[in-house]
A protein has these predicted regions:
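Membrane-integral, polyisoprenol-dependent glycosyltransferases
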Residues: 1-189
Length: 189
């Protein structure tokens, strides 16, 4: 073979690299037991619903709100019937953003101004948060068992239990934080 002016000399030619690794990383979308994963999520979510909704509207102290429910339940009721405006003369008490109180107002619109109405939205989001934690843990660990354990741990957590069964704003905040974290985990993949 004759050399041309455009061909590099034999000593400087690049030698193809042969590697046992694939050239493109293989996409890993998590565990392959999808049916078991959704069955686990359904069972854990049903258990969470049982614990969060059982006797949710039972009267406390003659039907009065407990702890800070005495602020948030009336403010949500006011927002419901005053087109989103609180007419609270103690404007110094209106220190929290309205989203949590608007969510409480949804329950009050459905069930009235009572314990079930105050606490319904928090219980729904508390149940959804358990499902989110189970799915997030499963996705991060690639293990259905780890996802189930994470969901069960959140079900048995006392703070999560109380936040989901009362009309306090902490449970709503926790739900949105977990949902945002879940969105980041999905976006990472």
């Amino acid at each position: 073979m004759t050399a041309t002016a455009t061909e590099p000399p034999a000593a400087t030619r690049s030698v193809p690299v042969i590697s046992p690794a694939p050239l493109v990383p293989v996409a890993d979308f998590g565990p392959v037991d999808r049916l078991n994963g959704w069955a686990m999520t359904s069972v854990v979510t049903a258990l969470a619903a049982l614990t969060r909704f059982l006797n949710l509207g039972s009267p406390t102290d003659a039907g009065t709100p407990i702890f800070d429910e005495k602020h948030y339940a009336p403010q949500a009721w006011q927002m419901l019937y005053n087109h989103g405006v609180e007419d609270n003369p103690g404007y110094g008490l209106v220190v929290h953003p309205p989203v949590g109180k608007q969510l409480i107002a949804i329950g009050e619109a459905l069930f009235g101004y009572n314990g079930l109405g105050w606490r319904f939205s928090g219980a729904v989001l508390g149940v959804v948060m358990v499902a989110l934690v189970a799915r997030i843990a499963r996705r991060m660990s690639r293990s259905t068992m780890v996802g189930a354990i994470a969901g069960l741990l959140l079900i048995s957590d006392g703070v999560s239990f109380v936040a989901a069964r009362t009309a306090l704003l902490d449970g709503f905040l926790a739900f949105f934080v977990v949902a945002a974290f879940g969105a980041l985990i999905v976006d990472r993949d």
